[in-house]
Amino acid sequence: MAIKLEDKKAIVAEVNEAAKAALSAVVADARGVTVGAMTGLRKEAREAGVYVKVVRNTLLKRAVEGTQFDVLNDVFKGPTLIAFSNEHPGAAARIFREFAKGQDKFEIKAAAFEGQFLAANQIDVLASLPTYDEAVSQLMSVIQGATSKLARTLAAIRDQKEAAAA
């Protein structure tokens, strides 16, 4: 089915805007995945602030041109499903990784983060990045641990001085 030039320009502009606003991108091949499963994937992605779209490769190459995601141009072969993470860099990678576990035919091709190409076997690195809330929680636990250790040390010094004075 042929797409009119105006429609192609609109698709390129839409995907380009999504790419400019995104923190990371993940590319997958969704051949053979049922419509119901894809609908579930899109719903989950929407809830996580991830933009998901199936785009023709030539249009996708034009859309990511000049963005940090043009490193993905070599993997735009065959049916391409692209996901841009807008709120957290690992969101799309996590969603795709979990979805791939239940779908035999769903294949993650690659990802890009901060202009760096990540092969399919490196997706776990991106997916394992902590969310903002998780990172703050980890930082607070480190600070709390250091504060507790300092308080115990000061109490031990005080007790030692009191024992020496008595």
From Swiss-Prot:
Pfam family name, one: Ribosomal_L10
CDD domains the UniProt entry points to: Ribosomal_L10
MF GO annotations: large ribosomal subunit rRNA binding; structural constituent of ribosome
A single cellular component GO annotation: cytosolic large ribosomal subunit
Coiled-coil segments on the chain, per record: none
Keywords carried by this UniProt record: Ribonucleoprotein, Ribosomal protein, RNA-binding, rRNA-binding
InterPro entries membership: Ribosomal_uL10, Ribosomal_uL10-like_sf, Ribosomal_uL10_bac, Ribosomal_uL10_bac_type, Ribosomal_uL10_CS_bac
Gene Ontology terms: biological process: translation
Keyword set includes Cytoplasm: no
This protein's record includes keyword Nucleus: no
Subunit structure comment from the entry: Part of the ribosomal stalk of the 50S ribosomal subunit. The N-terminus interacts with L11 and the large rRNA to form the base of the stalk. The C-terminus forms an elongated spine to which L12 dimers bind in a sequential fashion forming a multimeric L10(L12)X complex.
Task of the protein: Forms part of the ribosomal stalk, playing a central role in the interaction of the ribosome with GTP-bound translation factors.
Family to which this protein belongs: Belongs to the universal ribosomal protein uL10 family.
Protein name from the UniProt record: Large ribosomal subunit protein uL10
